[in-house]
Amino acid sequence: MIKRALISVSDKRGLVDFAKELDKLGVEILSTGGTAKTLRDSGIKVIDVSQYTGFPEIMDGRVKTLHPLIHGGILARRDNKEDIEAMERLGIKPIDMVVVNLYPFESVAKKHLSQILQPSDLNLQAFLEEAIENIDIGGPTLLRASAKNYKDVIVIVDPDDYSSIIEDIKKGSVSIEKKFELAKKVFSHTARYDALIADYFEKISPSGFKKDWTLPLKMTRTLRYGENPHQKAALYALNESPSLIDADVLQGKEMSFNNYLDTHSAVLLATEFSEPVCVIVKHNNPCGVAIGENIHTAYKKAFECDPVSAFGGIIAFNRVVDKETASEIINTFYEVIVAPDFDKDALEVFETKKNLRLLRFPSLSDKIQPSGFDLKRILGGFIVQEWDKVDNEFSQAKVVTKRQPTDEEWKALKFAWKVCKHIKSNAVVYAKEDRTVGLGIGQTSRVFSAKIGAMHALSSLKGTVVASDGFFPFRDNIDVLAQNGVTSIIQPGGSVRDQEVIDAANQYNIAMVFTGIRHFRH
């Protein structure tokens, strides 16, 4: 039977109705600060914790519930003779229910971090002071104590659990199985809360790879399935900005596991460019990329790169989608269109394709710099690395052949190099002016990628340029490229046979640039 409950919450959703039900059941309610005021204003009888303990709130509310009368009443084991004797001797009464949710540190941290990523002269100390005042101490202590003693204490951290708990109490009792599930939820919640704090401190003062690292993940929803229908899946969010998870889904079916993977890849590639760009992705690799004077021309060029592979793909734009572009897009089946926004006329066009997912992601109009680290799951752990981003990348580039690239070739080389970074290794990109024309993707041999990229081309490769994400180990790659009419190459260099490769390029009068930077992607 529930005789006494302690309630102290920041999130007051459903609070009053829940407390009224407890009041009707004759439960004595202890509370603090703003929660107590909310309950009293609603006509609910409340005892202040300070009155209950005989000790006032101190230090601007930093110390409110940290008292033996509170924690003894929570932690006492009802079936332990020594605990019961201690309660009787010290005048400690049992607390049977604890309802607590925590100061809104997460929202404060997210607000700060979204600003820290932009200006460089912000007052971090002012941010830190505000964040520190939103670090809850008493709340997690109450929750952890209650969850530890879940057999005797009902602990509620989620307002969504209020109604089911009331129903169970009215039926007679809350089962031990349900109490255990509530305790599990608490420990996950408090662990994430501490992880959010550690993550925030690290981001405002980075120290590289940490010895101990807990990711503050929160499930936003379950997904229909994973990569395949037999795999269960869910979507988890980090407290980061920008976040693809926060993108507005304007229409269409729910995003799938594969949709998110492909959209992520498309977004990262699209934000490499300041010019209007269209990126079409299929199975986590681009199949067409182009820049243009506007996104309509960019889309037409990107689509022409590989119309067959584009079917069922994902499109990313870094400009607002207009009616003209939308009218062109609906002629082909796509899974997702992601853009900074869609104008009203474009949305009306897309209404004819009800299942097509439209994602509004305003950050796409900017150069996105992913925060934190890039993680990849392996058996037993993670491998962690910095994101693949290099400032002033072309400042290290040098021409290693007799012939210099022309201005037009330089432009195409830089375009192809940006695309190549986002293709599975071994990657070879054939490009002409401002578009891809052939993509050699994910082959175990670089010369195979060179051959497959040429096979995919739907137009003549004469006068094209090529980008390779890794060095050419043998001259056979240059022979293949020359046979297909390539006039200029950009690659990292670094092979023991670099001179052999350079000599081959000179033989064919091909201009070649070494960047000194590799862009493998696995």
From Swiss-Prot:
SUPFAM superfamilies: Cytidine deaminase-like, Methylglyoxal synthase-like. One of its GO terms (molecular function) is phosphoribosylaminoimidazolecarboxamide formyltransferase activity. Residues 1-157 form the MGS-like domain. It comes from the Bacteria. Keywords: Hydrolase, Multifunctional enzyme, Purine biosynthesis, Transferase. InterPro entries: AICAR_Tfase_dup_dom_sf (IPR024051), Cytidine_deaminase-like (IPR016193), MGS-like_dom (IPR011607), MGS-like_dom_sf (IPR036914), PurH-like (IPR002695). It catalyses: (6R)-10-formyltetrahydrofolate + 5-amino-1-(5-phospho-beta-D-ribosyl)imidazole-4-carboxamide = 5-formamido-1-(5-phospho-D-ribosyl)imidazole-4-carboxamide + (6S)-5,6,7,8-tetrahydrofolate; IMP + H2O = 5-formamido-1-(5-phospho-D-ribosyl)imidazole-4-carboxamide. GO terms for biological process: 'de novo' IMP biosynthetic process. Pfam families: AICARFT_IMPCHas (PF01808), MGS (PF02142). GO terms for cellular component: cytosol. Its EC number is 2.1.2.3, 3.5.4.10. Pathway: Purine metabolism; IMP biosynthesis via de novo pathway; 5-formamido-1-(5-phospho-D-ribosyl)imidazole-4-carboxamide from 5-amino-1-(5-phospho-D-ribosyl)imidazole-4-carboxamide (10-formyl THF route): step 1/1; Purine metabolism; IMP biosynthesis via de novo pathway; IMP from 5-formamido-1-(5-phospho-D-ribosyl)imidazole-4-carboxamide: step 1/1. Belongs to the PurH family. The IMP cyclohydrolase activity resides in the N-terminal region. HAMAP family: PurH. This is Bifunctional purine biosynthesis protein PurH. It comes from Thermodesulfovibrio yellowstonii (strain ATCC 51303 / DSM 11347 / YP87).
